[in-house]
Amino acid sequence: MVMNTDSLALIKNSIKTIPNYPKEGILFRDVTSLLEDPQAYKLTIGLLVEHYKDQGFTKVVGTEARGFLFGAPLALELGIGFVPVRKPGKLPRETISESYELEYGHDVLEIHVDAINADDKVLVIDDLLATGGTIEATVKLIRKLGGSVNDAAFVISLPDLGGEERLKAMDLKLISLCEFEGE
C-alpha cells in the first residue's frame, strides 16, 4: 500500500466538513464520516501500518476518544499493545495525570501507571492535530513513566493552529494523512 495522491485524496474526501459546529465560525472536520466508509477507513489504517511497521514500536497510545478508533486497529495490525489515554476517572487502575491548557480553560488526561515501561518505544495517535495540547500532555505522561516517544500520527492536521510547531519543539516526528488549511 503506497501513500500516493489518490489514496490521500480518497481519505480527505471522506471527511465531512460541518460549518458552525460546535460554535459559530468553526469548520468542524467530522472523521466519523471516514469511519462510515470502509474503503477509506481500511486505507487509513493500511497507510499508517505501512509507514510504521518494522520500526520497533512496542505500544501505540491513543487519546480519548477518536484516537482509540485509529490507535487500536493500528496496534493490532502492528502486533503490539494499545494504551488508552483518558479523561479523569475513566481508568480503573492507578493512574498519573497531566493538565493542559485549552482555548478557554484547561483539561486533564490520565494513563495507567503500569501501562508504559522504561523499555517501551511508543507511537502516539489521534484523529486530529489542531493546537497540539492533547498530544503534548499525552507525551508528557508517557515520558513521566519512562517510555520513549518520538513519533505522533494524525489523520487530519490543521496547520494554521500551530500544533505542528508545538509538537516538533518536543522532538516529535509527525505525519498526518491530510491537511485542511485556513481553518
Swiss-Prot record:
Its main location: cytoplasm. InterPro entries: Ade_phspho_trans (IPR005764), PRibTrfase_dom (IPR000836), PRTase-like (IPR029057), UPRTase/APRTase (IPR050054). GO terms for molecular function: adenine binding; adenine phosphoribosyltransferase activity; AMP binding. It is found in: Cytoplasm. GO terms for biological process: adenine salvage; AMP salvage; purine ribonucleoside salvage. It is an enzyme of class 2 (transferase). Its EC number is 2.4.2.7. It catalyses: AMP + diphosphate = 5-phospho-alpha-D-ribose 1-diphosphate + adenine. Keywords: Cytoplasm, Glycosyltransferase, Purine salvage, Transferase. It holds the Pfam family Pribosyltran. GO terms for cellular component: cytoplasm. It comes from the Bacteria. The keyword Transcription regulation does not apply. SUPFAM superfamilies: PRTase-like. Pathway: Purine metabolism; AMP biosynthesis via salvage pathway; AMP from adenine: step 1/1. Homodimer. Catalyzes a salvage reaction resulting in the formation of AMP, that is energically less costly than de novo synthesis. Belongs to the purine/pyrimidine phosphoribosyltransferase family. This is Adenine phosphoribosyltransferase. The gene is apt.
